[in-house]
Amino acid sequence: MPIFKAKRLCPEAIIIRPKMSLYKRISNIVFSKFNQLTPLVETIALDEAYLDFSGTYQLYKKAPAELLVELALEIEKQLGITISIGLSENKFLAKLASSFEKPRGFTVIGKSEKLEFIKNLHVKNIPGIGPSLKKKLEKNSIMTIDDLRKLDKNVLAKSFGIFGKTIWNMSRGIDERNINPASSRKSISKETTFEHDISCLLYTSPSP
């Protein structure tokens, strides 16, 4: 929620300025722990990443779930913060799993249960389905991932091109994207949200 809306709803609210340098320092510590476990870390944001644990059992003699539990406990003990973890066979399912039971959540989506897990979720949970495509799908009575899964692959390809194949796969719990450390990005952003959309922004810097 934008700050101006929060102030309108709660005029007596005390707004605390963010401590960006602290957030970045803590993030660096957490990500260094990720990289100690596996070199395959794809950073999405200061507080989000994908980790690939393929082959790590030979090194640690521990299953990924055990390593992640130990990691979460170590981070909470050392830094006083909790992390939410999603463990599954691909990015889509792992990201989905991480959104459940926050904070301090740890959700696993196994191969045999993935279709049952995702079937009743709204199609908006599939990466790449934004407001516009969501509206088009809903217009055609496609509300859930299970609704999408029942469609013919060629129909989706005809309607949405190559992305049609992608969402057809994801409706079956299939995600062909690899963990790509080279594409990692980590940033802190500062935004100004206006009450109405504008087409030209002339000045954005605050006064000194």
Model-derived features: where do they sit?
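DNA-contacting surface of Y-family translesion DNA polymerases
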Residues: N125, L133-S205
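Long, highly charged, low-complexity intrinsically disordered interaction regions
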Residues: P64, L68-L121
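Generic non-transmembrane alpha-helical segments
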Residues: I29, K33-L37, E70-Q78, K136, ...
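Catalytic palm subdomain of template-directed nucleic-acid polymerases
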Residues: L51-L68
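Residues that scaffold, gate, or flank divalent-cation-dependent active/transport sites
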Residues: M1-L46, Y50
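Short, conserved phosphate-binding/catalytic loop or strand-edge motifs used
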Residues: L46-S54, E89-K91
